[in-house]
Amino acid sequence: MKKLLLLTAILSSGLYAASIDHIQTYSPDYLANQAQTGMINGVSAYYNPAGLGRLEKGKYFHVGFQFAHGHEKMSYKEKEHKAKLNQAIPNIALTFVDNKGATFFNFGGLAGGGKLQYDGVSGVDVLTDLAQFKLLGIYDKGSSLTGSNKYEQITLGRAFNIDDKLSFSIAGRVVHGTRKLNGSLNIGVNPTAQYRQEKAQQVAQEVSRAVDAATQGKGLSAAQIAAIKTQKTNEALAKLQKRVTDLTQNGLSGDIDSKREAWGYGFQLGINYRVNDKLNLAARYDSRVKMNFKAKGHEYQLQTTDILGQTIGLSTFYPQYTINSKIRRDLPAILSVGASYKITDNYLVSGIGNFYFNHQAKMDRVTTFGEHQHGRDYKNGWEIAIGNEYKLNDKFTLIGSVNYARTGAKNSSFNDTEYALNSVTLGGGIRYQYDESLAITASVAHFIYKGAEGNFKEKYGVTENQKYKKEITAVGLSITKKF
C-alpha cells in the first residue's frame, strides 16, 4: 500500500468529476468512450468486472496515464479569480482469466479534485458588502487560497461464470483520501467616521459601567467617580485610537495549513449477461464508503475580538478544515448499468446510465459563518453516455462518445473550495492493435461545464451572487498487454 501511495504525488482525481466527489475517469480509455459499463475489454476491471470471465484465458496487464489541462474561475461583481489546472493521473490494473472466471486488481484515482491555487477568492470579496464589516471599510490586500482533494482506491475481487451467458463479481475496496486547504488572509482596514464615532461611544459606555460597578459602595463622591470615569475613558479612547491607527496602517492577517485525511472501506458487486454474440448487458454497484476525515495542521486567525467580538479565520468559513476536527465526508454509492450492441462486425455502440446516491451520504455537514448550514442540501446525481467504436481494419479502431452529467449539487452547496457543475463531455480516440496480445489506445476528451451562480444573495443579503465556471481538456494513453 505504501508503495502505491507514492504515486499520489502525481495522482489527483476528480478533475472532471461527474458527481459531487466521484469520477469515472479510472482509465484513459474512458476519455474516448464514456459508455464502458456494458462492454467487455481490457478496462473492464474498472467498469464491468463481472464480464472479465468472458475474455480469453490469460493474464492481462493494463496501464494508463492521463493529463488534464484547463482552468476554473470564480467571480463576484467585477472581481474575477482564475486558477490554472495541469494535472497528471496514472492507473494500473491486473486481470487473471481462467475457465471459471477471473481475478482482478486495480489501482487509481477514485474521487476528489486537482490542485488549484487562487490569488483571492469570492468568499473574501463579498465581506466588503456585509453589514457587520462595512463600517470597518475592509478590502482584500492580496489573500490567496490553495486546495486539493485526492482519493486513491485499491480494488481486489473475483468474477464468477455461472454459465455461458451469466456471470457476477464481488470485490473489496480500500480508499484513502486527503483534502488540503492552504491559504492566507491579508485584509486591509479603513474604518469609516461612523465606525470611529460608534466605537468611541461604545467604549465610553463600557468604561462608565465598569467604573460604576467598581466604585459601588466605596463611599466616593459623584465628583470623584466622574473624575475616574474621565481618566479611564481617555485611556480607553487613546488605546482605541492606537488600535484603529494600527488597523489602518497594517491591516489584518491570518493563515491556515490544514490537511484532512481518512481511510475507508467498501465493496463492489457486478453482474453481466451476454444475451448473444451481439448484445451484452451489465451492471455494477459500488457501495458507499464512510470516511471520517481528521484535520491536522495549524491556523492563525485574524485578531478581531476587540472589533467584532470574535476571531475570524478561514476555518470560520470552512469549518470542516478546523484543526483537530473530525468530520464525516462519505463517498456516495454508485449504481451503473450499461449495454453494448454489435451492429456489424466492425461497428459497436454502447450506452450507460450512472446513478449517484448523494442524499444517503454524509458530506461535511457543518455550520459556517453566519450560522448557515452546509452539506445537507445535496440531491442525487446521474449521468448518461453513448459510445461508438468503428473498426477501420485489423489494426485501427476509431472511438467516439458523448456524456451528459448532473451532479446533484445545489447552488447553496457552492463555495470557494467546492462547486460541482453540470457538464457535457465530448470524447474521442483511436485504438491500435499491434498484435493479438497488445493494444494501445490514445484518447482525448473536452469537458464543457455549465456555469452557475452561488447563493450570496440569499446567504448574505447582498445584491449579487458569486459565479463559477470551468473548462477542462484531457488527453490519455493506455496500454493493454495479454500474456
Where are these regions (language model features)?
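Outer-membrane beta-barrel "beta-signal"
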Residues: 430-432, 438, 469-483
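Repeated loop/turn-to-beta-strand initiation elements of outer-membrane beta-barrel proteins
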Residues: 100-103, 165-168, 278-281, 346-349, ...
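Detector for outer-membrane/organellar transmembrane beta-barrel domains
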Residues: 270-274, 278-294, 324-408
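Residues that define the transmembrane beta-barrel architecture of outer-membrane proteins
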Residues: 43, 84-90, 150-154, 263-267, ...
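Residue-level signature of outer-membrane beta-barrel architecture
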Residues: 53, 94-98, 160, 269, ...
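Solvent-exposed loop segments that connect transmembrane elements
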Residues: 119-141, 180-257, 293-324, 361-374, ...
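N-terminal, post-signal peptide beta-strand-biased segments of exported outer-membrane/organellar beta-barrel
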Residues: 15-118, 122, 131, 142, ...
